[in-house]
């Protein structure tokens, strides 16, 4: 798992749910990883409670990029604080469509890991 952005994976199903963790062609965000980071930076709203308590850190999320490129299930792998966790999930659910991952030339559902940083500037 990377610190700056996300990672799809290469040809194994994770957990028997029909969602791949590793595929031949991982899902990609339109415009690439820098565009994904910029989207999150623009749309992430620092929770007031977290600001007041000077809470900073990373929420590690995992979500499914569906065969149509939309975001499916979102799972918090490592939380920070409840308000920050909810905001990270909200932003991920608002992401525009990805270019879906492919296995044997067909679009498939793929898990995608993404750390979201909360830093007070």
Where are these regions (language model features)?
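Intrinsic-disorder/low-complexity signature in envelope-associated proteins
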Residues: 1-30
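Short proline/glycine- and basic residue-enriched helix-capping loop/turn segments at helix->loop/beta transitions
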Residues: 26-64, 87-121
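A short acidic/small-residue loop/turn micro-motif
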Residues: 77-84
């Amino acid at each position: 798992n990377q610190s700056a952005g996300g990672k799809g994976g290469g040809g194994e199903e994770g957990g028997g749910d029909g969602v791949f963790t590793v595929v031949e062609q991982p899902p990609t965000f339109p415009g690439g990883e820098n565009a994904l980071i910029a989207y999150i930076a623009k749309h992430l709203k620092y929770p007031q409670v977290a600001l007041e308590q000077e809470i900073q850190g990373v929420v590690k999320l995992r979500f499914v990029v569906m065969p149509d490129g939309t975001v499916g299930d979102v799972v918090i792998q490592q939380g920070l604080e409840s308000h920050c966790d909810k905001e990270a999930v909200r932003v991920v659910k608002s992401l525009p469509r990805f270019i879906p991952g492919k296995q044997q030339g067909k679009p498939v559902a793929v898990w995608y890991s993404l750390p979201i940083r909360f830093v007070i500037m």
